[in-house]
UniProtKB/Swiss-Prot annotation:
<dbReference type="InterPro" id="IPR050117">
    <property type="entry name" value="MAP_kinase"/>
</dbReference>
<keyword id="KW-0597">Phosphoprotein</keyword>
<dbReference type="InterPro" id="IPR017441">
    <property type="entry name" value="Protein_kinase_ATP_BS"/>
</dbReference>
<feature type="modified residue" description="Phosphothreonine">
    <location>
        <position position="181"/>
    </location>
</feature>
<keyword id="KW-0808">Transferase</keyword>
<dbReference type="GO" id="GO:0004674">
    <property type="term" value="F:protein serine/threonine kinase activity"/>
</dbReference>
<dbReference type="GO" id="GO:0005634">
    <property type="term" value="C:nucleus"/>
</dbReference>
<dbReference type="GO" id="GO:0106310">
    <property type="term" value="F:protein serine kinase activity"/>
</dbReference>
<feature type="binding site">
    <location>
        <begin position="22"/>
        <end position="30"/>
    </location>
    <ligand>
        <name>ATP</name>
    </ligand>
</feature>
<comment type="function">
    <text>Responds to activation by environmental stress by phosphorylating downstream targets.</text>
</comment>
<dbReference type="GO" id="GO:0035556">
    <property type="term" value="P:intracellular signal transduction"/>
</dbReference>
<feature type="binding site">
    <location>
        <position position="45"/>
    </location>
    <ligand>
        <name>ATP</name>
    </ligand>
</feature>
<feature type="modified residue" description="Phosphotyrosine">
    <location>
        <position position="183"/>
    </location>
</feature>
<comment type="similarity">
    <text>Belongs to the protein kinase superfamily. CMGC Ser/Thr protein kinase family. MAP kinase subfamily.</text>
</comment>
<feature type="short sequence motif" description="TXY">
    <location>
        <begin position="181"/>
        <end position="183"/>
    </location>
</feature>
<feature type="active site" description="Proton acceptor">
    <location>
        <position position="140"/>
    </location>
</feature>
<protein>
    <recommendedName>
        <fullName>Mitogen-activated protein kinase CPK1</fullName>
        <ecNumber>2.7.11.24</ecNumber>
    </recommendedName>
</protein>
Length: 366
């Protein structure tokens, strides 16, 4: 089925045939289509970010990061549709690989076998290793951001909240609210240190999300479906128990310490009781990813060597990514001073830079 291009106001070249709407978000629409010259099936994401600075930031992050990473378990950018001029530049069109579904939909529609859980966790960790090797935190890992196709290939998507874990350059500001501001990721997959405002977030926040995703695949429902901030923390503590003194002392926020002190003591629950279908190796991986203290949490490299994913682990085929160039995230540290027009100009310049992919090469050579 071909949709009417004028109906949805998609300004893309005639080299693309639009077929169906496959997703809609706060500031974007995703349409499945075909790149006619090559016959490649694609997803075209139309983003309209210029009404809000936050959307501009996310869009610029996403384009820059998708351009940087070339990895089997990270969604790739195939093309950026170039606008006719800066004056008519009101939308961004990102062309990506078309994936048939996502893990959220799969979990809701069927019970996953342990083999599926292993393979999906392994691929998530493999993609995450590439991100972390470049000092990038995803910060919003959740089932709907893990795209899947019929072969069970998994790709991490949505880098709008991703940030560098490197320290801000000297003499720059991150808004004065502590390292890592503007955190609005889905509450259910947020690590305790995010909830309790530890001074800095580390790569460990993504491993917490992996643990939540594994438990959700095993149980068929979210592990910590908090209704609000207080309920979310309560659900986490019902499972992990009251923090030990060592864990408690890692918290840098006095307000968070006072909040925890006021709560009733709770005993730790066993993950084998919470996830009764889980194999012993899965239970062990849950224990090591879902720790209260980020310093005690397993790293992505350690998780790839865990017995739960040993059927897939191949140290020679789990590549690191190229390091980010110095200044890659510089725009983050001047965000308060930038006008909307300056954001627009930066995104325009990024879009003007061609993406060297199969699609662009095909179009140029034919």
């Amino acid at each position: 089925m071909t949709i009417d291009q004028s109906q949805i106001n998609f300004n893309v070249p005639s080299t693309y045939k639009l077929e169906e709407i496959v997703g809609e978000g706060a500031y974007g629409l995703v349409v499945a289509g075909t790149h006619l010259p090559s016959g490649t099936q694609v997803a075209i994401k139309r983003i309209t970010p210029f009404d809000h600075t936050m959307f501009c930031q996310r869009t610029l992050r996403e384009i820059k990061l998708l351009r940087h990473f070339h990895h089997e378990n990270i969604i790739s950018i195939l093309d950026l549709i170039q606008p006719e001029s800066y004056e008519v530049f009101n939308e961004v069109y990102l062309v990506q690989e078309l994936m048939e579904t996502d893990l959220h939909r799969v979990i809701r529609s069927q019970e996953l076998s342990d083999d599926h859980c292993q393979y999906f966790v392994y691929q998530t960790l493999r993609g995450l290793k590439a991100l972390h090797s470049a000092d990038v935190l995803h910060r919003d890992l959740k089932p709907s951001n893990l795209l899947l196709n019929a072969n069970c290939d998994l790709k991490i998507c949505d880098f709008g909240l991703a940030r560098s874990s490197a320290k801000p350059p000297p003499g720059t500001s991150d808004g004065g609210q502590g390292f890592m501001t503007e955190y609005v990721a889905t509450r259910w997959y947020r690590a305790p240190e995010v909830m309790l405002s530890f001074q800095e977030y580390t790569k460990a926040i993504d491993l917490w999300s992996v643990g939540c995703i594994l438990a959700e695949m095993i149980n068929g429902k979210p592990l910590f479906p908090g209704r609000d901030y207080h309920h979310q923390l309560s659900l986490i503590l019902q499972v992990l128990g009251t923090p030990t003194m060592d864990d408690f002392n890692e918290i840098t926020s006095q307000r968070s310490k006072d909040y925890l002190r006021a709560l009733e003591f709770t005993r730790r629950q066993d993950f084998s009781a919470i996830c009764p279908k889980a194999k012993p190796a899965a239970v062990d991986l849950l224990k090591q990813t879902l720790t209260f203290s980020p310093s005690k949490r397993i790293t992505v490299e350690e998780a790839l060597m865990h017995s739960y994913v040993e059927a897939y682990h191949d140290p020679h085929d789990e590549p690191n990514a190229e390091p980010l160039k110095p200044g890659f995230f510089d725009f983050e540290f001047h965000q308060e001073k930038l006008s909307r027009d300056q954001w627009k100009r930066m995104i325009y310049d990024e879009v003007q830079d061609p993406v060297p992919t199969i699609l662009s090469q095909w179009t140029e050579s034919h």
